[in-house]
Design a protein with these regions (language model features):
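Elongated, amphipathic alpha-helical interaction scaffolds
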Residues: 1-180
Length: 180
């Protein structure tokens, strides 16, 4: 079930008893993702939990959050990396953190889905692998022939079985996403 859409590419969904927040794709490296996802998950919890329930004496049971970012940008990036909100905190003395637990933490798993990153997730998820292949096709097409149309690239992808069913159904949406 989709609970909340932050932007057209951001999504939050319930899976079993967990709240999984996905940023479907990030084409630029953004070390502020933990902060942004903290904001997103706060909004999701606001929608899930009635106001009156938040003020009851007994603790609420909340869906467990997991945070993922799919990176498909051009800059070099490891196959997987964990970003931590606490890395952004201004702490007067580093030794303070050793003695005291951090009161607020968000861990974001950034997964590089570029074909050349050779991430194992692509072997396990055909759709994601095809998406990554499509992104690579678009890049190659722009580099080889800047005048070639996006339409030609999408037609080539469909002919090669790359997200063909999806591209046939949603070609205008995909075109708009790739142009943005």
């Amino acid at each position: 079930n989709i609970l909340y859409t932050v932007r057209s590419n951001d999504i939050a969904m319930l899976v079993d008893d967990r709240l999984v927040v996905l940023l479907e794709h990030q084409s630029t490296i953004n070390e502020n993702m933990p902060l942004r996802l903290l904001e997103y998950v706060s909004r999701v919890y606001e929608q899930l939990i009635p106001i009156r329930t938040r003020y009851k004496k007994k603790a609420m049971k909340l869906p467990y959050p997991e945070f993922y970012v799919f990176y498909d940008g051009k800059d070099s990036y490891p196959a997987e990396k964990t970003l931590k909100l606490s890395d952004a905190f201004i702490v007067p003395e580093k030794k303070y953190l050793k003695k005291k637990n951090i009161s607020l933490e968000i861990l974001v798993k950034v997964i590089n889905i570029n074909i050349e990153a050779n991430n194992s997730i692509l072997k396990h998820c055909k759709t994601l692998e095809e998406y990554s292949t499509l992104v690579e096709l678009v890049r190659e097409s722009k580099q080889e022939n800047p005048d070639s149309s996006l339409e030609e690239t999408l037609t080539k992808a469909i002919k090669n079985g790359i997200l063909s069913e999806y591209l046939q159904r949603k070609s205008s949406e995909v075109r708009n996403m790739l142009i943005a």
